[in-house]
Amino acid sequence: MLRVAVPNKGSLSETATSILKEAGYATRGDSKSLTIADEDNGVEFYFLRPKDIAIYIASGHLDIGITGRDLAADTREEVDELLALGFGASTFRYAAPKDENWTVEQLAGKRIATSYPNLVRKDLANRGLEAQVIRLDGAVEISIRLGVADVIADVVSTGRTLRQQGLKPFGDPLCVSEAVIVGRKGAEVTAEQSVLIKRIQGILHAHNYVMLDYNVARENLDKVAAITPGLSAPTVSPLANDSWVAVRAMVPKTQANSLMDELSALGAEAILATDIRIARI
């Protein structure tokens, strides 16, 4: 059976589990369950700490897994990123008290608190800087107030937690992260792995696209096709009135309203947008 690692808790867990369920896979009924065997699909899921998933994949004990790009990088394990999943977006930044003006160069010789010590050490080494990296397992933001650290390095999603603690980020992001599927470094993607990846891709396409249907005068077909090209080309079907055609195309969900406005301005009629439940592109 294909062995797949899934985050057991945290911000990645709920969305990852939801996508797998939409993709037709069995999900655990008890949040404390560590494994579940989906016999119908030939997959066994292991629910693990997100920080540990890349370790299990790199060692070959599991085949593929869902984790954060930043979490995988911090393990220093060699894994291949097979698919970016588009959720769990964040950046990894240095941060300091908002009334202090820090630059990255000033980190030399300072104390940096973080839950991602390897990412920080790698960044410092790349910059030719030496600093004391203090590993904490959580609540990193409070370490400056308690005198444990001079600055912190932490995951930033909305920045609200930093602001609540009177901190602000500085310097470029050390890592731009999102949820990803990872596999063992250099390993060929198997047929079983490909099926799971394509199923998940189909769900992501369904989340991100809508199907746009409309009727338009044949003389305007080239114009409307230019703004709704679909993924390959729009589907064009004849109507009872030979001077008109029906057009169908997938469009990004975020652009649907503006595209409908443009189509209407070009004389299109009966413009409908419908959700896509599952797709194979």
Swiss-Prot record:
* Catalytic reaction(s) noted: 1-(5-phospho-beta-D-ribosyl)-ATP + diphosphate = 5-phospho-alpha-D-ribose 1-diphosphate + ATP
Q: What's the Enzyme Commission number for this chain? A: 2.4.2.17
Q: Which GO terms describe its biological process?
A: L-histidine biosynthetic process
Q: Annotated Gene Ontology MF terms?
A: ATP binding; ATP phosphoribosyltransferase activity; magnesium ion binding
The record's keywords, sorted A to Z, are: Amino-acid biosynthesis, ATP-binding, Cytoplasm, Glycosyltransferase, Histidine biosynthesis, Magnesium, Metal-binding, Nucleotide-binding, Transferase
Tell me where it mainly resides.
cytoplasm
Looking at the UniProt entry, the stretches that span the membrane are: none
Q: Looking at the keywords, is Cell inner membrane present?
A: no
Give one Pfam family. HisG_C
Which coenzyme or cofactor does it need?
Answer: Mg(2+)
Q: How is its activity regulated?
A: Feedback inhibited by histidine.
Which CDD domains does the UniProt record give?
PBP2_HisGL1 (cd13591)
Q: Where in the cell is it found?
A: Cytoplasm
Does Magnesium show up as a keyword for this record?
A: yes
* Pathway it works in: Amino-acid biosynthesis; L-histidine biosynthesis; L-histidine from 5-phospho-alpha-D-ribose 1-diphosphate: step 1/9
Which superkingdom is the protein from?
Bacteria
GO CC, sorted alphabetically, is:
cytoplasm
Q: Which family does it belong to?
A: Belongs to the ATP phosphoribosyltransferase family. Long subfamily.
Q: What HAMAP family does the database record attribute to this sequence? A: HisG_Long
Q: What's this protein's function?
A: Catalyzes the condensation of ATP and 5-phosphoribose 1-diphosphate to form N'-(5'-phosphoribosyl)-ATP (PR-ATP). Has a crucial role in the pathway because the rate of histidine biosynthesis seems to be controlled primarily by regulation of HisG enzymatic activity.
| Protein's UniProt name | ATP phosphoribosyltransferase
